[in-house]
Amino acid sequence: MKKFSAIFGLLSVIFVIMAISQVSGLSGAITPPKIDIMVNASNGLPQDINSIIYVKNPNSFPVKVEMVTTGDLNNSKKVEVKIMKNNFTLKPGETVGVNITFTVKEKDNYEGDILTKISPVDYGDDKKGVNLKASVVLPTKVAIMVVGNEIHTKELVITAVLIISILGLGAMLIRRHL
């Protein structure tokens, strides 16, 4: 019986220690996860397209937010990306809309990501805040397709010749049977 009481007491102490210890985690949320853009080149280039990415801090502590681009979105000669609000702090539970402008300069298809890095705020010398060294990186996929109303002369001529040939052949067959 003494052995049972000792084990029960030890388990109770372990449970109480686990219950009062604090565990901190880091998370974040972004919307939308994907941005698809279609640009009509017949309206002329360059063209500006605006979009918004919403960043939310679901944590109980403030976080730093930094946004960077990858892939084709880094080629400023063809497409330029302007992130209007970058390197900012979010309070616990706060959501912010970040305006983004894509300036498409050349006709092509572009793919890349806008990476949103969320990391805890450093509370200074006294370190009273969250002691996390981790960061969370959330990607937003971006696909830009540039289309135009170019007239493909060669294809149109071939199509017209085929249609006229079929109509002529049909007319000859109808005459023969009449």
Swiss-Prot record:
Coiled-coil stretches: none
Annotated compartments: Cell membrane
Entry keywords, A to Z: Cell membrane, Membrane, Transmembrane, Transmembrane helix
GO CC annotation terms, alphabetical: plasma membrane
Membrane-spanning residues: 6-26, 154-174
Superkingdom, natural source: Archaea
Membrane topology, record value: Multi-pass membrane protein
Keyword Transmembrane carried by entry: yes
Classification via InterPro entries: Ig-like_fold
Name of the protein: Uncharacterized protein MJ0288
Organism: Methanocaldococcus jannaschii (strain ATCC 43067 / DSM 2661 / JAL-1 / JCM 10045 / NBRC 100440)
